[in-house]
């Protein structure tokens, strides 16, 4: 006898049922009957992530332009690279919100209250790096919580946030290395 346990349920719903369900609520696009997450909650969480990314873009841009001192050129280049990556993340998140039939909230009103990260300017190059590192660490923790919440209910949003999380972790490592390089 085969050691693999067999499930009595069919692997997929019969094709006739799949086709019929696909025609229902066609205006919802990618949000099908099989979508099991609370769409409104997911859109709210994604808008918070969007605000976080936008605040990070703004902070990194300021730090890029304000970086001064002996190590400023290499650190500013890192700030610029991170700002560009955060902008890509913002665009990806906004695209997913639209795919879920939501509206991405780009309004400056309340941007800081929606964002998990703060907008801190920093007085010196080291302060700027530390503020960016704190913001990355906040994003890492909040995105991990979002990923846990999404679980299998919204695997597409979960994978998006997992990909973004990996970049945020790399950014945190970059910033720690910059601090070590400056101290050396």
Regions found by a protein language model. Give the residues of each.
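Iron-associated oxidoreductase/ferritin-like identity signal
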Residues: 1-184
């Amino acid at each position: 006898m085969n050691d693999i346990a067999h499930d009595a349920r069919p692997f997929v719903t019969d094709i006739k049922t799949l086709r019929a369900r696909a025609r229902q609520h066609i205006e919802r696009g990618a949000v099908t009957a099989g979508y099991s997450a609370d769409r409104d909650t997911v859109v709210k969480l994604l808008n918070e992530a969007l605000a976080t990314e936008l605040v990070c873009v703004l902070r990194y841009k300021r730090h890029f332009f304000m970086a001064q001192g002996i190590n400023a050129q290499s650190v500013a280049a890192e700030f610029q690279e991170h700002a560009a990556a955060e902008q890509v993340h913002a665009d990806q998140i906004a695209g997913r919100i639209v795919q879920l039939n939501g509206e991405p909230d780009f309004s400056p009103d309340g941007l800081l209250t929606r964002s998990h990260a703060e907008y801190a300017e920093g007085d010196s190059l080291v302060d700027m790096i530390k503020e960016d590192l704190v913001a990355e660490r906040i994003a890492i923790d909040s995105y991990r919580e979002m990923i846990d919440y999404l679980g299998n209910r919204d695997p597409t949003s979960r994978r998006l946030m997992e990909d973004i999380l990996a970049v945020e972790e790399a950014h945190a490592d970059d910033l720690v290395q910059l601090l070590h390089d400056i101290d050396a």
